[in-house]
Structure formats: structure tokens, C-alpha cells
């Protein structure tokens, strides 16, 4: 069985994680104590992708919950699914990282990291065939970004051949939670580029937009946002957990989605999203799902793919879906919007089908796109970073924890390189022979 070890770090990571486990437990027919009371054999068949079976039919999430302060953990423990998790897997410090990346990465986080790795090791050793790790964190805070990336590199050292998927909540364009967000995010991206295999970029503002515009919620709470994220996370791993005609897993996803090793930052989307009142007025069909899935308003990261081009993308359909219909729709999308796909990758779209839809829906689809327009996101953070860094604002908080200014400069240039790489492949055409013009006469002489 292809097991996944799930690590949630920081406040944001733990809250998204809590929503995710609620979604997954529901799909597998588990109640809030981890006792199975589902209706279908299929729910049990691959339970152990995310759950360990404990004594007397209790299933326990293979989750490691990490934070540098006990507050969020207590909230998770007191929440509706708090009794689900194994108590040993809660690992928290008492000091908090105070939105400071250096604290999470070098001082406070570094003290806690060995404890976390012990638990991760224990969980990994209990697996038959470990597929990889999923990490949820935000890039704006201290723990999720600093300690999350520290864990990422430590786990990478120890399990170099396992997949690393991160769900990273990136800073929003207009709404900022913390002033030093650009610093924390840039330092994190610097790590993610090197150590992650797939990074799914999510941002709160795009989620708010979806909640207000599509789901028609007047004042969405974080719970609603986390629900959207957990729908996508469930969709991405659905093929591991339920049988389907076309399977995909984290590794297949990476092979099909990452044309160049550094360009592994994806946009995600989910369909069908309808407001509660409008359910009865829409038929959920494959064309309808496809249209909504490729709609820029449905993307959960604030960058518009119409400003760039897709290198690759992947669509995962769930439910009773005809294979042929999906293929026709995908071909249709590529032919109609050919300008949005790079022409030097002929078949950009990977599809996966899974027979079991999410709870309460007949069919659904999850979209993952590797678009060059994600550079907007990094550009935006980079501009904010350089504005602050030029004046060395807030820098003493980081240097006080033992960081060097060089690290900031390195992180900044690494992120700028990433942006220019995306730009380069966005502009690349299929017949670029300009570079070889000087050499042409030589061939003629031969």
C-alpha cells in the first residue's frame, strides 16, 4: 500500500490539516473517534494510505502535528475530530516563533526538530511502502515557514527518494497578516525550490474571492476557506485511496507535471463549486466541470493563468464519468485555448479517473496546473521584499537569531531566478533555431 505521512506545521498548517482530516474521515466512513461505520468495502480497502489501524478497529491518522506554541494544538484537540489523533504525535514548544522565520528555522524550531523527526521516523517505519510526505504550512508566519522548511530539508536528507508534496499558503496580494510576510515567504521559497517535489500554492485572498463570488457567502470564516483547501487535497490523493480506471499518485503527478526540476509550483482548483441555493439549478456534467475547472476565477492562488501559459496540467475526475467524454473535453480545451498551452509540450494535460465521488456530490474534478503565470505571485512578494530589504527594515529580528544578511540576498536572487526561468519558458517557441544560425554554413561545407 502506498502510505503517506502527513505533517502539519504552524497555526495555518494545523487548521488546514484539521479540516482535511475531517474531509478524509468522512470519505472513509470514520466517525470522530476513528471508528469505522461506513457502508462500502471500498472505503476500507485502502484506508492505510492515511490511517494506521490500532486495536479494536480504531483508525488513527498518520499525522504529525507540529507547532511552537500549544494554542492551536489545544484548539485541534478540543475540535470535533480532536480524539482522532494519536496523543504522542502532538509536538509543540512553549515559546512561539512570533512570525519570525529565523526562530522557526534556526533557534526555537531547531530545538524541537529532532523530536519531530523521531515521530516521523516511527510513522515511516510502520509503513509497508512509503509513498511520501505531505506538509501543510503557510509561508507568511514563523513556524510553518521557518520550521516547515527545516523539516522539509531534514526529511529530504533522510528519505531522499520519497516524494515531498507541500501545500503552501502563500501571502495574498492585498491582505497581509504580518508585516514581515515578504521576508518569511522569500526565505521559504528559497528552501522550497530546492527541497520540495511539488508545491501546491494556495492563497487566502483567492479563497475569499471564491467564497464570496461563487459560493455566495457574505462573510466567509477561515473554516470555509480550509474546507475548500481540504477538497483539493482530498482530490489530489483520491486515486491512491479509491480504485479508478486511470490511477495517479504523487510520483506520477510529479513526473507528468514537472518539466524542469525547479518549476514545481502549481495552481489548484476544484469543481463543482456552487452556492448552496443554486445546487438544484445546475446539472453537473463533464463539460460543465471542465469549464468551471479551467475558469481563472476558480483558481486558489491569486495569479491569472491568462497572463502566462500552461507548461502542464492535470485533471482528476471523480464519480461515474465516461473515459471518452473526459478525453474529448480535454482535447477540446487544448484545441480551443491552444495559446494558453506551450506548444513544445504536445499533450499537456494528464487525466486521472476515480470511481468514488466525494460525499454529497455525484461527480467532481480537481485541477492542478503548472502555469508560468505563477511568477506573478513570486514577483509580488519579491517587490515587497526588496522594498523592505533596501532599508534593512525589521532585519534586526532575524540577525538577532543568528542569521546573516547574505542569506537574504541569496534567497532574493534565487526567487528572482525562479521568476526569470518561468518567463523564459513562457516565451520559448517550438522552432527556436536563431541560436544556431552562425553554425549553419559549416554544415553546408561538409
Swiss-Prot record:
Listed GO CC annotations: cytoplasm; microtubule
Keyword terms: Cytoplasm, Cytoskeleton, GTP-binding, Magnesium, Metal-binding, Microtubule, Nucleotide-binding
Binding positions for GTP per the UniProt entry: 11, 69, 138, 142-144, 204, 226
Gene Ontology BP, a term: microtubule-based process
Top-rank taxon, per record: Eukaryota
InterPro entries: Beta-tubulin_BS, Beta_tubulin, Tub_FtsZ_C, Tubulin, Tubulin/FtsZ-like_C, Tubulin/FtsZ_2-layer-sand-dom, Tubulin/FtsZ_GTPase_sf, Tubulin_C
PROSITE patterns in the record: TUBULIN, TUBULIN_B_AUTOREG
Subcellular location(s) of the protein: Cytoplasm, Cytoskeleton
Pfam families: Tubulin (PF00091), Tubulin_C (PF03953)
Cofactor(s) listed: Mg(2+)
Residues annotated as binding Mg(2+): 69
One MF term in the entry's GO annotations: structural constituent of cytoskeleton
SMART domains in the cross-refs: Tubulin, Tubulin_C
Stated family: Belongs to the tubulin family.
Assembly with partners or alone: Dimer of alpha and beta chains. A typical microtubule is a hollow water-filled tube with an outer diameter of 25 nm and an inner diameter of 15 nM. Alpha-beta heterodimers associate head-to-tail to form protofilaments running lengthwise along the microtubule wall with the beta-tubulin subunit facing the microtubule plus end conferring a structural polarity. Microtubules usually have 13 protofilaments but different protofilament numbers can be found in some organisms and specialized cells.
Task of the protein: Tubulin is the major constituent of microtubules, a cylinder consisting of laterally associated linear protofilaments composed of alpha- and beta-tubulin heterodimers. Microtubules grow by the addition of GTP-tubulin dimers to the microtubule end, where a stabilizing cap forms. Below the cap, tubulin dimers are in GDP-bound state, owing to GTPase activity of alpha-tubulin.
Name under which the protein is recorded: Tubulin beta-2 chain
Organism: Hypocrea rufa (Trichoderma viride)
